[in-house]
C-alpha cells in the first residue's frame, strides 16, 4: 500500500451502501507534491479504491470547464 497524507478533505461526492465514500481530497502520495484526488475510501481511510489525481493547474482548467458547462441532464 502506498504511503499517503491527506492534507485537506474537501468533500464527499457519494456514499455506497457498504459505507465507502467517493471523496475529493488534497493529498500527497509517497511524499510527493500534493494533488487533488478523487477516489473511494473506507470509513477509517485505511483502504482505498482506484482513483484519479489532478494537479493544481489541471484543477484550474477543470473548474473553468465546469463553470462554462450548462447543467447536463441524463437520459439523452
Q: Could you tell me what each predicted segment is?
A:
Residues 1-76:
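Positively charged, low-complexity terminal tracts
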Amino acid at each position: 500500500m502506498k504511503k499517503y497524507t491527506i492534507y485537506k478533505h474537501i468533500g464527499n461526492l457519494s456514499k455506497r451502501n457498504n459505507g465507502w465514500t467517493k471523496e475529493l481530497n488534497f493529498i500527497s502520495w509517497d511524499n510527493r507534491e500534493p494533488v487533488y484526488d478523487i477516489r473511494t475510501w473506507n470509513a477509517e481511510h485505511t483502504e482505498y479504491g482506484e482513483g484519479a489525481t489532478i494537479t493544481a493547474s489541471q484543477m484550474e482548467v477543470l473548474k473553468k470547464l465546469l463553470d462554462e458547462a450548462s447543467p447536463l441532464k441524463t437520459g439523452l
